[in-house]
Amino acid sequence: MHLQNSDTQALELQANTLTWQAWQTFWASHLGKEVLKVEAEYLAPIMESLRGYHVLSVGSCPSKPLLENCTIKHQMEWRPNFDLAEHGSCLIADPSHLPLPNDSMDVVLLHHSLEFFDRPHALLKEAARVTLPKGELIIIGFNPRSLWGLTRLLPKGLQAEPLQVLKSAQFISQNKLLDWFEFLDLKQEERQLFFHRPPCNHQKPLERLAALDKRLGKKNWPLAGIYLLRIKKRVGSPLRPIVKKPSPSWLPAQPVSSPTRTSLKIQKEK
């Protein structure tokens, strides 16, 4: 076991920040806005059904539209650095070494983050570690067996600017995810496939093709562009971090009002 040296931490921070900023270009595009809108619609009933005290979002964009209907009031979200933290409930850390206790989160949302980071398996393991037994992980990602998966194979010069971020993204197959879930003692309980429109960044064609989503939206067509997974953490041996975590800086989250369970205490770094 060893501590990450300061040079490694600095490089990872810089890489995460640059990747985050590249994804913001995508989410600000016509296509990105439409994707986020549809994802929020599919997440809404799930968020309304959640129970617990603490939810953590690790993703490639601000989580406000995704957590809008969440019944869990104590909400934290990851950011790559302090400059990108909009409020006091942002967690600033290497996402594969979260400064959180084992079994401390009722729900962890991974929104396109397995595609975002260089070590998706390490991120998933860390998310599982901080999730309570019988807690939930919710994973949203792009389906590699779709037009979205084919688009990332195009030469960079043929891709529209908002889509260039997909070139470096890691599209992970369902079979590989199932292998990871088994290794981490996780059980997939629900899988939804949606967004049947091609990755086209033109507003009018996107609006015209919206009928495809209405026609195929609830059929889990295997070539749909986006998947949503609900994962349950089984009760078993606790997962431990691979290495001893450094002491990263983070902003403290606001405490939950009147909890019946001891609230998570995160101390501000001095």
Regions found by a protein language model. Name each.
Residues K187-D213, P222-L223:
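Conserved catalytic loop of SAM-dependent methyltransferase domains
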Residues S96-V108:
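A short acidic, Gly/Pro-enriched loop at the edge of an enzyme's catalytic core
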Residues H2-E48:
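Class I SAM-dependent methyltransferase Rossmann-like catalytic core
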Residues L154, K167-R191:
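Short alpha-helix
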